[in-house]
Amino acid sequence: MSRKPRVLSRPMAWRNAVNGVLQQLTGYQLRRGPVPAPRTAPQPDATKPSAAGRAAVKAPAVKPAAAKRAVVKPVAAKPPPQFPADYDDEAKDILRAVKPYTMTSPERLNAFVLATRHIVRHDIPGAVVECGVWRGGSMQACARTLLSLGEKDRDLYLFDTYEGMTPPTAEDLRRDGRSAQELLDAQGKDRPIWAVASLEDVKEGFAGVPYPEERVHYVRGKVEDTVPGQAPEQIAILRLDTDWYASTRHELEHLYGRLVSGGVLLIDDYGYWQGSRQAVDEFLERTGERLLLLRMDEGRIAVKP
């Protein structure tokens, strides 16, 4: 069977003619190849996580509970009170023991301890009198100091209403000028400014101090009603802490004369309540008493000539 001659299409014939000439001139020919697909940005593989996804996998979301645990910090225990370096160990122990029963600052408590040592060391006769005792912590400090010195026969007098503060007067302003009455009205009677403590509470606190009960005298009522009638004739330490002008003036007028020579006067609120300061300054001006009032933070201390 004879083959039929191959008939080329015109495009193919044209291409062959061109390739023949191109081959002779350059050694190259034109070849038809597959047309490449247009280049586009690679599409993400659905089976593989994206970069953001990988980041999410590497950093899982923090659970709310874990986040809360991460920011909660333990509350450190309240450190014990720090005392100046010159406070002796015995005084520090006394101050720590009475802390729950007093609002008196460490400096003023330490001054009371030193005053108590002073009257024992120098045989100063008389009782220890405190006007305004709150829960009795300051007088507890005195009693503990007496016990540490082996003295148990000195009378202790605690004058107080045992119902809280008495009404202030116009003279009674805080050091910043605010009225004491305004401050009292703004706070409930359970707040420290009212200084409410019952007689039973004070006695309960003293039960932990082995000082002879018959030597501890609780005098209940306003000092204007109980002083001088129920006060001792001789006083070795006179501590005034009733805050207000009228009560402080009354105490100085009726008790300072009973403070013996060499005895110690402690005024707790001289630098805090203007009425207390005014009462003291007026008394010293009126009597001409030459007292050097030494600062014990907001209080004052003096030894009677």
Predicted regions and their residues:
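N-terminal pre-P-loop "Q-motif" helix
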Residues: E107-A111
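Membrane-proximal basic amphipathic "stem/tether" segments
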Residues: M1-D89
